[in-house]
């Protein structure tokens, strides 16, 4: 698997909506995945024999317009979450500089360890609200999917989850790639 048509950072400016106010949400089962309150990592692991994190890039970056409340530099981590070697999710995480030195989490040393394992194993990180976004077939996310040999015939969907640690807030965005949506439909009882 190689990603050649784009480069880090892959993210784009996104209009996020509160799930309660979002209109025209996709039908189940994708809707259920978008709104799932627990760890997406755990949910994904339950659908495969081999789960892996492919790092696309990480480093200090200025957030995209409207992406973070402050326009100060944050640590950005972009990965693909793969199930049995197939990319299902593109994830983009924004971590404020003040959280990088917290003793409870070694964000800089995560490597290929899933971020969800860290966040959901620490009581000091409190999951917050979920927001939803829709991506057109000509978005950067769609281009990324196409570079992974995934055909983008329909709009794509993603979610952004807030995590709170003391007075700080970090964001984890998870966008479902076409392979995930197709597999979810097959998994539906």
From Swiss-Prot:
Entry keywords, A to Z: Cytoplasm, Lyase, Pyruvate, Ubiquinone biosynthesis
Subcellular location: Cytoplasm
Binding-site residues, substrate: 77, 115, 174
Reaction catalysis annotation: chorismate = 4-hydroxybenzoate + pyruvate
Molecular function via GO: chorismate lyase activity
Chief location: cytoplasm
Enzyme class: lyase
Superkingdom of the source species: Bacteria
EC number(s) recorded for this UniProt protein: 4.1.3.40
Pfam name, any one: Chor_lyase
GO biological process terms on file: pyruvate biosynthetic process; ubiquinone biosynthetic process
Pathway(s) where this gene product acts: Cofactor biosynthesis; ubiquinone biosynthesis
CC annotations in GO: cytosol
Biological role: Removes the pyruvyl group from chorismate, with concomitant aromatization of the ring, to provide 4-hydroxybenzoate (4HB) for the ubiquinone pathway.
PANTHER family hit by this protein: CHORISMATE PYRUVATE-LYASE (PTHR38683:SF1)
Name of this protein: Probable chorismate pyruvate-lyase
Gene name tied to this protein: ubiC
């Amino acid at each position: 698997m190689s990603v050649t048509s784009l480069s880090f950072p892959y993210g784009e400016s996104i209009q996020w909506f509160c799930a309660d106010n979002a209109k025209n949400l996709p039908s189940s089962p994708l809707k259920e995945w978008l709104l799932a309150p627990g760890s997406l990592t755990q949910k994904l692991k339950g659908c495969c024999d081999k789960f892996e994190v492919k790092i696309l890039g990480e480093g200090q970056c200025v957030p995209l317009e409207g992406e973070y409340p402050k326009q100060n530099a944050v640590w950005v981590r972009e990965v693909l979450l793969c199930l049995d070697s197939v990319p299902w999710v593109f994830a983009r995480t924004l971590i404020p500089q003040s959280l990088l030195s917290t003793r409870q989490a070694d964000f800089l040393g995560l490597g290929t360890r899933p971020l969800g394992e860290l966040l959901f194993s620490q009581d000091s990180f409190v999951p917050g609200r979920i927001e939803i976004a829709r991506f057109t077939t000509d978005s950067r996310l769609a281009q990324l999917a196409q570079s992974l040999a995934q055909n983008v015939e329909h709009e794509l969907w993603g979610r952004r989850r807030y995590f709170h640690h003391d007075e700080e807030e970090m964001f984890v965005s998870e966008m479902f790639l076409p392979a995930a949506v197709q597999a979810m439909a097959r998994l539906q009882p």
